[in-house]
Amino acid sequence: MFQGKCAFFDETVPSALIALWQLHNGEAKFLAEGYENFDYAFSMHLRKHVRLPNYKSVQCRSPWWIAEQVAVSRSKSYVSEPVIHLNVMEPLYVDHRIRSVYLQPLPSTLSFLNGELP
């Protein structure tokens, strides 16, 4: 899934996402934006991209930490596809067909989503 890839993580990214990336043999780095030797950039901030000619940026949205791969072509058109659906704690399963990893949410989160009071 992420094998042989290098990623840049900023301070907004949860440690679970970094650990997940590393579990799939990806290399993690904390570097200033503009550094060119990484394949993916992770940030919680929406629409925050690394300004490089060819890059793939992953954006994380709280509370589910949904990450989307954004591929930028030479024609400047944007193509988005899901890469990681990151909930809170334990790994649930990996779907290699759509290159997605799902992490299990906390039980209290599930109850809240079902309309129950915490």
UniProtKB/Swiss-Prot annotation:
GO cellular component: chromosome, telomeric repeat region; cytoplasm; meiotic spindle pole body; mitotic spindle pole body; nucleus leading edge
GO MF, any single term: protein-macromolecule adaptor activity
Keyword presence, Amino-acid biosynthesis: no
GO biological process terms held by the UniProt record: cell division; meiotic attachment of telomeric heterochromatin to spindle pole body; meiotic telomere clustering
Localization, UniProt: Cytoplasm; Nucleus; Cytoplasm, Cytoskeleton, Microtubule organizing center, Spindle pole body; Chromosome, Telomere
Main location (coarse class): cytoplasm
Sorted UniProt keywords: Cell cycle, Cell division, Chromosome, Chromosome partition, Cytoplasm, Cytoskeleton, Meiosis, Nucleus, Telomere
Subunit structure: Interacts with bqt1. The bqt1-bqt2-sad1 complex binds rap1.
Purpose of the protein: Involved in chromosome segregation. During meiotic prophase, connects telomeres to the spindle pole body by forming a bridge between the telomere protein rap1 and the spindle pole body protein sad1.
Name the record gives this protein: Telomere bouquet protein 2
Annotated source species: Schizosaccharomyces pombe (strain 972 / ATCC 24843) (Fission yeast)
Biological classification of the source: Eukaryota, Fungi, Dikarya, Ascomycota, Taphrinomycotina
